[in-house]
Amino acid sequence: HSVSASSAPYRLSDALNRHIPGLKSTLLLRRRKEIDGLEIHRTPARRATDALRRHLAHGFDILLPERRKDLPFSLNVLGMGFDTAQMEKADVVHLHWIGGRTVDFSQLCHIRRPLVYTLHDMFACTAGCHCTMDCGLFQDECRGNCPQLGAPRLFRNIPAWLFSRKRRAFGRIPSLTLVTPSLWLKREVERSCMFPGRKIVQIYNPVDTDLFRPAENRNAIRAGLGIPPGAFVIACGATGLFNPVKGGHFIPLVLEEL
């Protein structure tokens, strides 16, 4: 079971369909994945635009050779278009993980339905980084020398331009509610000037309690896994656990303190 941000909409859609009578949740994906019990549609492929986006990203790396490669930074320029007619039957459109090159933010205003946007990192409220790593420039429209890009003086206005472009796109959306899975992320979004006047709500990610529940025979399961009955066990996991953003490097330090 994946613990990445991309798995959250699958769990949510499944929970809504199973537990709320009369509600129908379907998924619109860039890359179609077959999931049992879920109705999934795919956005039309645009190979020429996809190729142009890849070349643009490559040029971005050439212009900014000092950019931190261990931290993601997404341009969101020439993002993927989509057919809004696919969403006309919906009462609410819920956006998940539209960062990077997946969606052209400037087209979101054409969706004539209330939008809910669940943020799984800080990308939506910055110029393009997914975690600020304690940089406070996102509170001032990312004006200044971005520590993640390490841009030469000629290109130091790129983050401010990206921030302004994204803010204009969000500002044109008639109805937009923001959701964060954690209180920390909610507070970070509130510190940004990306979403003035927008409602921000904290809602935890759903967990399938039919799957993740206390075991009926704990000792038998431990024995099957080779874990002593009285052992103290700490479980942790993430996609890219030792990415600086995920904090996996703190695990040995925590264990030393126990």
Task: For every predicted segment, state its role.
Residues 110, 123, 138-179, 187-198, ...:
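Membrane-proximal helix-turn-helix segments that form the acceptor-binding/catalytic region
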Residues 38-80, 150-158:
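A short, charged, and often flexible helix/loop element on the N-terminal side
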Residues 1-42, 88, 111, 174, ...:
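N-terminal subdomain of nucleotide-sugar transferases
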Residues 163, 213-227:
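A short helix/loop element that forms part of the nucleotide-sugar donor recognition site in Leloir-type
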Residues 227-246, 252-255:
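Conserved donor-binding/catalytic core segment of Leloir-type glycosyltransferases
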Residues 184, 206:
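Carbohydrate-associated surface elements
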Residues 36-42, 107, 127-132, 137, ...:
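Short aromatic-enriched loop/helix-cap "lid" or pocket-rim segments at secondary-structure transitions
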Residues 82-102, 114-120:
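Short N-terminal targeting/anchoring amphipathic segment
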